[in-house]
Amino acid sequence: MDDELREIARLEAVGELSAAHARAIALAQAHPHDVRAQLAAAYACDRNDREHDAIRFYDAAWKLGVPTAEQPGFLLGYGSTLRNVGRTDESISILTDAVRRFPDRAEFSAFLALALHSAGRSTSAVATLLKSALQAARPDGFGPYRLALAEYQKLLADEAAH
């Protein structure tokens, strides 16, 4: 299986996404109880704009138990894909949990902001995106306006909470 996973990664790296997708699906079907095979299929479906297909592989991986080292990428991919297929409440739940579990990873807040926007929660989305931008910015990012932006972010977050 390791050789097959390496071959899928190689195909993706050289842009042969359809071939990688076909191999990943075959691998997941041949190894339904292997979380690595399910993850490979989920990610390959996502890369081929087959988000609805990806969901069943994400679900299978979740049930099998995603290894700790794989959880950040899994949670981001799963949460984003749920949003893309219109399951925004589930997306928000997963991404909110990811923000709590990985507070130093600004990408989770950015994807959570997209999910909040998709759910029509614009104030929360802007507050979350602003938080992500402030978190990811270099120390001198936003210059003398950093404190003002941080205050606006707090005000928006408070407004969204009420």
Task: Name what the model sees in each region.
Residues P32, V66-A69, P103, A137:
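Short coil turns that delineate tetratricopeptide repeat
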Residues W62-K63, H117-D140, A150, K154:
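TPR/TPR-like (Sel1-like) alpha-helical repeat modules
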Residues L17-S18, E51, T88, S122:
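TPR-repeat structural position
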Residues L39-R101:
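Alpha-helical adaptor scaffolds
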